[in-house]
Amino acid sequence: SGLIIDVRNNGGGNVTNSERIAARFTNEKVLTGYIRHKTGKGHNDFSEPYSIELEPSNSIRWQKKTVVLTNRRSYSATNDFVNQMSCLPNVTIMGDKTGGGSGMPFTSELPNGWTVRFSASPHFNADMEQIEWGIEPDIKVNMDETDETKHIDTIIEKARAFLKGEWTPAASE
């Protein structure tokens, strides 16, 4: 048994909330990544990386197997949540690569009325790999066309089978 968290098609939200949720899945402090801040006008004017650590919640924590479902429409604070969860030993990320972005967007209007929005602070995972362009899942699973015509969610069904120990990625190859 286990838990499935489906963040597919989630455009983001509040980074603080993603941290509060992820904190329910660890009993100890975990390094989840790094962030750099802009320090000047130059293209490469950024601070040294600051570590980001996930502190365990002071409330109820879930320590059983967990699968987080992702796709290319998982953005911003959702991307941060997936990154945090990917650092936890009882969590498996399944589905497709996330859409990327960080939870710290900068938005401004140009003189012509166009709106510009971009990540103000580059985020990296615990291995110092850029996550702004998305996070690959631990297990890639695509929707099956036959299942889709029958209104069956292939990805959820694979996650259920994985949690029950009835399916492994190697067994399907």
Walk through the language-model features, giving the residues of each.
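Terminal peptide-recognition signature
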Residues: I5, F25, T66, M85, ...
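Low-complexity, Gly/Ser/Thr/Pro-rich intrinsically disordered linker/tail segments
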Residues: I135-E173
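Extended C-terminal subregions enriched in glycine
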Residues: K65-C87, T92-G99
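C-terminal soluble interaction/assembly domains
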Residues: S86, I93-P111, V116-F118, P122-F124, ...
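Gly/Ser/Thr-rich loop/hinge elements
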Residues: G12-K65, F124, Q130-I131
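Extracytoplasmic/secreted envelope proteins and their assembly/folding machinery
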Residues: S18-A22, T66, T78-V82, I152-R160
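Sec-exported extracytoplasmic/periplasmic mature domains
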Residues: S1, A23-V30, S86-N90, R160-T168
